[in-house]
Amino acid sequence: MLEQGLLVTAGVAFLISVALSPLFIPFLRKLKFGQSIRDEGPKSHQKKSGTPTMGGIVIYVSMMVTSLIMAIKFNYLGAEVSLLLLVTFGYGLIGFLDDYIKVVKKRNLGLTSKQKLVGQLVIAIAFFLIGKGQAFHTYIMIPGTDVKFELGWAYFVLVLFMLIGGSNAVNLTDGLDGLLSGTAAIAFGAFSIIAVAQEQFGVAIFCMAVVGAVLGFLVFNANPAKVFMGDTGSLALGGAIAAVAILLKQELLLVIIGGVFVMETLSVIIQVISFKTTGKRVFKMSPLHHHYELCGWSEWRVVVTFWSAGFLLAVLGIYIGVWM
């Protein structure tokens, strides 16, 4: 019965997302909330200038409303779901402010890096203080084994790193039409299966609400995109997936299931270090998806390849997290 409930959860979130998007996109156009395209980006992206952004609000509303209603309906509105809603709201709010400054105040960089970091830190600290001992404990598990290591207060540092790093890594992935929507749906789908295996049904409901919401958004975000999610969506999704991994005690497994996000982030780190130390670039452009674009791949080919990689990594993660 619960399995059907999870499918219903995804279905409801999908329908809300699909229903809201056609109403919200013209509203964004009317407000002239269009995406600015950086001059240093791929030239093929210049035609996307003016495409409505902040569409992440649709994802945000769809998954928050659905997960809350379904968690109440199935009596799983506990500490875990409450924490996930807190993180999603907090990081989504930071993303919203960042987008708002970019498109309304016409300040291309949005929030300063310090402002964004302070906001991310506040949410991460609140998550740790509220959840410690109630929704999660301060040890990590080796994936596929019963081996655990108690970290004590060092776990606090890990939580900060995961939430801040996770939100930024997912944000970096949001650079091509449909790329993040698809990879996020795959990753949250994998974690929902692990959550069911652990009988963490509240977390599973939340994950399936995200899956439905991003797939509904993908209908309008696939190439050629009619709307972008902006930081409103990407930061919320990044914070949420890191929080899910923490609550399921699959902190290390996030590196595999979120492997696409990790690769995107590493490409940026490698590029910066290489250029600062040698004056040479390893990639034609970072994050990694832009490198393949400049190698002559079509945008759709890059997106499908990254989706495929995300799917294979998700299957590996499920195998380790459930069957091993």
From Swiss-Prot:
Membrane-related topology note: Multi-pass membrane protein
Main location group = membrane
* InterPro entries membership: Glycosyl_transferase_4, PNAcMuramoyl-5peptid_Trfase, PNAcMuramoyl-5peptid_Trfase_CS
**Reactions it catalyzes:** UDP-N-acetyl-alpha-D-muramoyl-L-alanyl-gamma-D-glutamyl-meso-2,6-diaminopimeloyl-D-alanyl-D-alanine + di-trans,octa-cis-undecaprenyl phosphate = di-trans,octa-cis-undecaprenyl diphospho-N-acetyl-alpha-D-muramoyl-L-alanyl-D-glutamyl-meso-2,6-diaminopimeloyl-D-alanyl-D-alanine + UMP
Tell me the route in metabolism or biology where this protein functions: Cell wall biogenesis; peptidoglycan biosynthesis
CDD domains the record matches: GT_MraY (cd06852)
Which BP terms from GO are recorded? Answer: cell division; cell wall macromolecule biosynthetic process; cell wall organization; peptidoglycan biosynthetic process; regulation of cell shape
Sorted keywords for this record are:
Cell cycle, Cell division, Cell membrane, Cell shape, Cell wall biogenesis/degradation, Magnesium, Membrane, Metal-binding, Peptidoglycan synthesis, Transferase, Transmembrane, Transmembrane helix
UniProt GO cellular component terms: plasma membrane
Q: Please give the start and end residues of each transmembrane region.
A: 5-25, 52-72, 77-97, 122-142, 149-169, 176-196, 201-221, 227-247, 253-273, 302-322
The name on file for this protein is Phospho-N-acetylmuramoyl-pentapeptide-transferase
Gene name of the record: mraY
